[in-house]
Regions:
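Short C-terminal tail/terminal secondary-structure segment
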Residues: 2, 152, 208, 212-213, ...
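Canonical Rossmann dinucleotide-binding motif of NAD(H)/NADP(H)-dependent dehydrogenases/reductases
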Residues: 5-38
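Substrate-binding pocket helix/loop in short-chain dehydrogenase/reductase
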Residues: 103-104, 111-116, 142, 198, ...
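Active-site loop immediately N-terminal to the catalytic Tyr-X3-Lys motif
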Residues: 105, 152-158, 180, 217, ...
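Active-site helix of classical SDR
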Residues: 127, 163, 171
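Alpha-helical segment proximal to the catalytic Tyr-Lys
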Residues: 132, 176-180, 238
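Residue(s) in the substrate-gating loop at a strand-loop-helix junction
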Residues: 147
Length: 254
């Protein structure tokens, strides 16, 4: 369907350095819809693996290193990504994130700073870098990854909840500025998702209790994010901006 066709579009995706992760599934969705995709950031070991998995530039993927929390590394990585895409970026998907669990009274200052740096500050700076290009183009799509903890406080995840709440407000603030310029800024809030990192929790007693509360009666899978990702990256969402879309199996409706 032409409305969802991304042929010729140029995309940068952060947080997709793991083959089994959510953001790689989203990067795949963009690629399958026709976009040329840069995977930006992550450890060099993971990125080298992703180069092998994706097949490299010949197959429409580029893999670029860069520490998103370091200004010079982030800017150099973005510049390389932009060069790979011929100087244009139509889609930015901000998926890089981290988590740290600790009671608030004992939360280490350096861990608080680290979580906020990756989940919120780096996201803003990536939006800023891509936004400058998109403003010159007069068009663009930015997709930020929020969380259930954008709406729910969670338990012993103060920094994560604060950062993901910030993602929602950042998305709205940028939408207010940039929608009049032809740039749509939206967010996806994944629910409880089945990944390599969450598997042990999913099969625990707590995980079973969570499953019982999800109307879909299962945890989400990375591929459950593919459809909404293509929608938000395509012309189908041209009149949608500042929105936060939960993909949670109905969890928030309970």
């Amino acid at each position: 369907m032409k409305l969802f066709d991304l042929s010729g579009k140029k995309a940068i995706v952060t947080g997709a350095s793991r083959e089994t992760g959510l953001c790689y599934a989203q990067a795949q969705a963009l690629h399958e819809a026709g976009a040329e995709v840069v995977l930006l950031g992550g450890s060099e070991k993971n990125l080298e693996h992703m180069r092998q998995v994706t097949g490299g530039p010949e197959s429409g993927y580029h893999v670029v290193s860069g520490d998103l929390t370091d200004k010079s590394s982030r800017e150099e990585g973005f510049a390389r990504a932009l060069e790979c895409l011929g100087g244009r970026v139509d889609i930015l998907l901000n998926g890089a994130g981290t988590q740290f669990r600790c009671p608030a009274a004992e939360f280490p200052a350096e861990k608080w700073a680290h979580v906020l740096d990756i989940n919120l500050s780096a996201m803003f700076y990536m939006c800023q870098l891509a936004g400058r290009v998109m403003l010159e183009q007069g068009s663009g799509k930015i997709i930020n990854i929020a969380s259930m903890n954008s709406f729910l406080g969670g338990h012993i995840v103060a920094a994560y909840a604060a950062s993901k709440g910030g993602v929602v407000q950042l998305t709205r603030a940028l939408s207010n500025e940039w929608m009049p310029c032809g740039i749509q800024v939206n967010a996806i809030a994944p629910g409880f998702m089945e990944t390599e990192l969450s598997h042990d929790m999913m099969i625990s007693q707590t995980g079973k209790e969570i499953t019982a509360r999800i109307p879909a009666r299962r945890w989400g899978k990375p591929e459950d994010l593919k459809g909404v990702t293509v929608f938000l990256a395509s012309a189908a969402s041209d009149y949608l901006s500042g929105a936060v879309i939960p993909v949670d199996g109905g969890y928030l409706g309970k």
